[in-house]
Amino acid sequence: MAVILKHLAIILLVFVIEIKMGQGSQIERRSSGVTHEMLSSISKPEKRFAFEDTVANERSPQITFSTDWGQRKRSVNEDREAAERERSPQMKRSEHEEQLMAKDEMKRFQEERNPSSDDKIAIDKRSPRYLPTII
């Protein structure tokens, strides 16, 4: 089973790489399965990738390759920080407030499940139609 999943993952990876490189039309003409040509194209990426500022591609001409991973990581962190600053005050609850809310929900749930003795009818939340059950 693991071998089959491994082969399927390799096939999927090859198809994704082929589509990303703009050779999706060639995939349709090939028979299914991993060929030697496909595996050799994966093992030699220097022939397939052009590390330039802009790669001319008929599908999306604005693809850029950057080798400065530090800059990319900084921009991702800046985006996350900006998103944190833009969050509404309701979403910025502290962990303590969230724990209190969870405790309140648990109390309400327990009260619904175990009503007091003076209640004659309780709603059974497990039933899909919320049919009242007599205690």
From Swiss-Prot:
The keyword Protein biosynthesis does not apply. Expressed by the venom gland. It comes from the Eukaryota. It is found in: Secreted. One of its GO terms (molecular function) is toxin activity. One of its GO terms (cellular component) is extracellular region. Keywords: Secreted, Signal, Toxin. Residues 1-24 form the signal peptide. Residues 75-127 have a biased composition (Basic and acidic residues). The keyword Transmembrane helix does not apply. Residues 61-135 are annotated as: Disordered. Belongs to the scoloptoxin-22 family. This is U-scoloptoxin(22)-Er1a.
